[in-house]
């Protein structure tokens, strides 16, 4: 091409680009054209949110309309009248309100798929712990210096001048009012006996109380016969809440017998396995449960390496039930994933390399550019299957891109995040932008027993009312249920079977719900 023609080409191309930019930026000539452009922009934005690809059936649309009617009224009443929006308030205050709503009742009835982020000592209700577990033989209690009750199963009473052990049965009988005693005991253990949002000024002070809960119950619930029944009760409660599948993080080590025998991790895994299999035989509609070994992030590097080796052995021996390894506990004051790097790399440096799945808690924090939120970098580089909490993920655009590219879902636990001090008003949850852009998200409940939440329905309700917009309801809820199967650690074959079971229950739920709404449909028509 000649120099002259090259210059002409460049000039023409420049003019075309300038003209196109001018046309794009030019003011719209009419209000109608402006509104058309505005609607198009809003629709394009909405098309990217979680659940936007779901196409509802006619029956589902009926149900969606009823949920949206209540949701919009609550939002509009609060926004226009400047009154408190209760679904986003402290769970301590909002729980009773939530329980009265139409949307919550629908969510309770709705098959929600799986709960993928749960911990072993807070999965069944405190009502069961108090009314069943503390009524067993050899259950003792003592009051510590803070007047908190500690519970243990004991054969021999240890001398302890700071916490004198007394038989619970005797204390209950001597109280003169069994119901009042049990109510007092439950309130003493429950994290919801006060409002954590106003009671605790910092995240650290919240965690002091949270860790106290585990100290109060571990000596009771780790007694092997009680743990067996406690886990069975948890499965009953999750199934009653229309949850079909769970993935449970458990320490596995330390279940004990009355004679002082302390069991290893394989015993703990087999306890869960036998109860799960028995439960599935009794309830074939229940998809199942699987276990993740959780180490504590204040342990030594040598202890974590030993746990990783045990996790490898369990994964080889029980590949269909044992999923992998995680590190749990408050991230801010404890060791980072990088601190344990040699231990966590151990499986990959074997010959041949062994792929031990990881399910790391990472960035459960409000801080930025610290070793805590940089746990995300290590979690992703160590090929974590999912990220627990991931509260600070949105602050790291490259981490966010990498996680989405690799299909690494975030396990969001909205009530837990509020109760543990990360967000007061759940509408301001850090991960709302990811939900608005259809990032891989699952909703779980973390430790529902500790704060008297339902197994999963309360968290689904809070997610519906606070984490997505005014015009979003059943598409969002349905996508969350589907995500819980898609991003579970089940095999591909298991996922196909799980989705089939879930679909059967979903279709039945929609039909039954719409049938129940028919009188109200007629009233509205």
Swiss-Prot record:
Substrate binds at residues 120, 207-214, 329, 447. GO terms for molecular function: adenosine deaminase activity; metal ion binding. Binds 1 zinc ion per subunit. Its EC number is 3.5.4.4. It is found in: Secreted. It catalyses: adenosine + H2O + H(+) = inosine + NH4(+). One of its GO terms (cellular component) is extracellular space. Keywords: Disulfide bond, Glycoprotein, Hydrolase, Metal-binding, Secreted, Signal, Zinc. The keyword Cell membrane does not apply. Belongs to the metallo-dependent hydrolases superfamily. Adenosine and AMP deaminases family. ADGF subfamily. The active site is at 364 (proton donor), 389 (proton acceptor). Glycans are attached at residues 81, 132, 188, 334. Disulfide bonds join 142-163. It comes from Aplysia californica (California sea hare). InterPro entries: A_deaminase_dom, A_deaminase_N, ADGF, Ado/ade_deaminase, Metal_Hydrolase. This is Adenosine deaminase AGSA. Adenosine deaminase that may contribute to the degradation of extracellular adenosine, a signaling molecule that controls a variety of cellular responses. May play a role in the regulation of cell proliferation.
């Amino acid at each position: 091409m000649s120099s002259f023609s090259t210059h002409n080409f460049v000039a023409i191309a420049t003019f075309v680009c300038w003209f196109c930019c001018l046309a794009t930026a030019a003011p719209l000539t009419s209000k109608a054209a402006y509104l058309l452009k505005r609607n198009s922009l809003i629709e394009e934005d909405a098309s990217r949110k979680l659940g936007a690809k779901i196409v509802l059936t006619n029956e589902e649309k009926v149900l969606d309309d009823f949920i949206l009617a209540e949701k919009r009224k609550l939002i509009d009443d609060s926004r226009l009248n400047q009154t408190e929006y209760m679904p986003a308030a402290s769970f301590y205050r909002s729980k009773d309100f939530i329980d009265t709503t139409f949307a919550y009742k629908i969510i309770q009835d709705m098959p929600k798929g799986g709960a993928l982020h749960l911990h072993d000592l807070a999965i069944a209700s405190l009502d069961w712990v108090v009314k069943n577990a503390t009524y067993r033989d050899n259950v003792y209690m003592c009051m510590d210096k803070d007047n908190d009750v500690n519970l243990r199963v004991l054969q021999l009473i240890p001398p302890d001048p700071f916490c004198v052990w007394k038989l619970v049965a005797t204390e209950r009988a001597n109280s003169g009012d069994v119901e009042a005693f049990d109510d007092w005991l439950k309130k003493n253990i429950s994290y919801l006996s006060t409002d954590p949002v106003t009671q605790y000024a910092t995240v650290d002070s919240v965690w002091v109380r949270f860790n106290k809960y585990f100290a109060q119950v571990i000596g009771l619930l780790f007694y092997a016969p009680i743990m067996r029944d406690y886990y069975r009760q948890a499965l009953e409660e999750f199934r009653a809440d229309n949850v079909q599948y769970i993935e449970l993080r458990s320490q596995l080590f330390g279940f004990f017998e009355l004679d002082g025998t302390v069991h290893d991790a394989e015993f703990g895994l087999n306890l869960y396995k036998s109860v799960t299999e028995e439960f599935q035989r009794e309830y074939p509609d229940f998809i199942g449960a699987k276990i993740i070994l959780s180490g504590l992030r204040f342990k030594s590097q040598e202890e974590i390496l030993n746990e990783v080796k045990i996790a490898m052995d369990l994964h080889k021996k029980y590949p269909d039930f044992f999923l992998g390894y995680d590190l749990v506990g408050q991230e801010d004051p404890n060791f980072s994933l990088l601190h344990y790097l040699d231990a966590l790399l151990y499986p990959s440096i074997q010959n041949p390399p062994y792929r031990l799945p990881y399910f790391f808690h990472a960035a459960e924090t409000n801080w930025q550019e610290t070793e805590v939120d940089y746990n995300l970098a290590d979690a992703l580089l160590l090929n974590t299957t999912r990220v627990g909490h991931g509260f600070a993920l949105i602050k790291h655009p490259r981490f966010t891109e990498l996680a989405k590219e690799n299909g690494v879902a975030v396990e969001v636990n909205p009530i837990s995040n509020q109760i543990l001090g990360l967000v007061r008003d759940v509408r301001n949850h850090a991960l709302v932008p990811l939900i608005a852009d259809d990032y891989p998200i699952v909703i779980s409940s973390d430790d529902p027993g500790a704060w008297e939440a339902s197994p999963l329905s309360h968290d689904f309700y809070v997610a519906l009312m606070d984490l997505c917009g005014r015009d979003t309801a059943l598409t969002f809820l349905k996508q969350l249920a589907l995500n819980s199967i898609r991003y579970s650690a089940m095999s591909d074959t298991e996922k196909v079977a799980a989705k089939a079971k879930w679909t059967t229950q979903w279709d039945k739920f929609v039909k039954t719900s719409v049938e129940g709404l028919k009188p109200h449909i007629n009233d509205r028509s």
